Swiss-Prot record:
EC numbers on record: 2.5.1.75
Record protein name field: tRNA dimethylallyltransferase
Catalysed conversion reaction: adenosine(37) in tRNA + dimethylallyl diphosphate = N(6)-dimethylallyladenosine(37) in tRNA + diphosphate
InterPro entries: Dimethylallyltransferase, IPT, P-loop_NTPase
Sorted UniProt keywords: ATP-binding, Magnesium, Nucleotide-binding, Transferase, tRNA processing
Positions contributing to substrate binding: T67, A68, S69, G70, K71, S72
Name of the gene this protein is made from: miaA
Residue numbers marked as site, Interaction with substrate tRNA: T156
Cofactor(s) for this UniProt protein: Mg(2+)
Family statement drawn from the similarity comment of this UniProt entry: Belongs to the IPP transferase family.
Source superkingdom: Bacteria
PANTHER family the record matches: TRNA DIMETHYLALLYLTRANSFERASE
GO MF terms held by the record: ATP binding; tRNA dimethylallyltransferase activity
Length: 363
């Protein structure tokens, strides 16, 4: 169901984009490459060119891409132009204790547009893709019932994939068991927990890296709860939750050199504008088991600085390196896993600014 319908939002979006910076693989007759004429770009929003077109379907826009690619700015402008509301689809931006290190949208944005599922959950609360999907689905339906356009912004591939294509319904894990497994992990660490998992569920152990704490704990919990491998549930038919909606996916894909530059600049800004104090407060108020598993880049490095294991410059440099590596993995994932999408490309800040300057004005 990844297709255009008869609304004009993507047509208007593409209409203002410069010739060189966009291509789409959502056209009936092949891709629009760099240098394509504006006339051919207009076809992206033409319902005659789209598959599975249905005027009865409501639209959802998903704006995805690597960290520091400009998603928040573009999404905000899109929401202002098309009477939209924004929903978070980033697994780390749900936590209320870490808005700075996760680069959550600024308060100034939230005075102009309604934002949902940002910074609402405590780190001590259990959260999963299933819980996210339930909340996101509720928000999407609320927004469309108000006659507005839901715009989801983020870079968490698992959430996006599950929302668009469906999910494997793994039984809920009891809170008592979750607490037991987390306490066990704190006591014995990753390597020994992985060894235990290998005895119970060799299939999961063969697919999960010992250093991937979150997946390791999750797989152990699932086996303890169900007696089955977490991967056995992936062979079951996926449950579709928004089959009556039409997804339109826009992928921001900056040129790599520029992306790495924006990653470095963002981390530098975040470190200077409160991230150190933010993580210091977490370290003071919470037990290590509540924050050591968080995957937001920068937390691990700042903790190393606070513990005296790195200088501030070393922590920043390490965080920048890890952010660039993460961004590269995100780009690869979106290129390979999401086929029907519109891709926006730009090589520097000037191109990005010019490309998106008043892109949604109806002419």
């Amino acid at each position: 169901m990844l297709a255009c319908n008869d609304d004009t939002s993507l047509y208007l979006l593409v209409k203002q984009v410069t010739k060189k910076e966009i291509y789409s693989n959502d056209l009936e007759n092949g891709n629009v490459k760099r240098g394509a004429s504006m006339q051919s770009l207009y076809l992206i929003g033409d319902p005659k060119c789209c598959r599975n077109n249905s005027s009865k379907q409501k639209s959802i826009i998903i704006l995805c891409g690597p960290t520091a690619s400009g998603k928040s700015y573009l999404g905000h402008e899109l929401a202002k132009a098309y009477n939209g509301e924004i929903i978070n689809i980033d697994s780390m931006q749900v936590y209320k204790e870490i808005p700075i290190i996760t680069a959550s949208p600024p308060k100034s944005y939230k005075t102009e547009i309604l934002y949902h599922l940002y910074n609402f959950l405590s780190m001590t609360e259990d959260f999963s893709v299933i819980k996210y999907l339930k909340l996101a689905t509720e928000k999407i339906k609320e927004i469309t019932d108000r006659g507005k356009l839901p715009i989801l912004i983020g870079g968490t591939g698992l959430y996006i994939n599950s929302l668009v294509f469906g999910y494997n319904n793994i039984p809920d894990i009891s809170e008592d068991l979750q607490e037991q497994v987390r306490n066990l992990h704190v006591k014995i660490g990753n390597i020994e927990l992985w060894s235990k998992l290998e005895k119970f569920d060799p299939l999961a152990a063969s697919k999960i890296n010992q250093n991937d704490t979150q997946r390791l704990i999750r797989a152990y919990e699932v086996f303890m709860q169900t007696g089955k491998s977490i991967f056995s549930f992936q062979t079951l038919p996926k449950e579709q939750i928004l089959s009556d909606f039409n997804f339109k996916i826009i992928f921001l894909n900056p040129e790599r050199k520029f992306l790495y530059k924006t990653c470095d600049e963002r981390l530098d800004k975040i470190f200077k504008e409160g991230a150190i104090d933010e993580i210091a407060l977490i370290k003071k108020q919470f037990a290590p088991k509540d924050y050591t598993n968080l995957k937001a880049v920068g937390i691990k490095e700042i903790l190393a600085y606070l513990n005296g294991n790195l200088t501030l410059d070393e922590a920043l440099n390490a965080a920048q390196i890890r952010t660039r590596q993460y961004a590269k993995r995100q780009v690869t994932w979106f290129k390979n896993q999401i086929q029907d999408k519109i891709t926006l490309e730009y090589a520097n800040q000037e191109e990005f600014t010019q490309t998106l300057k008043n892109p949604f004005k109806i002419i």
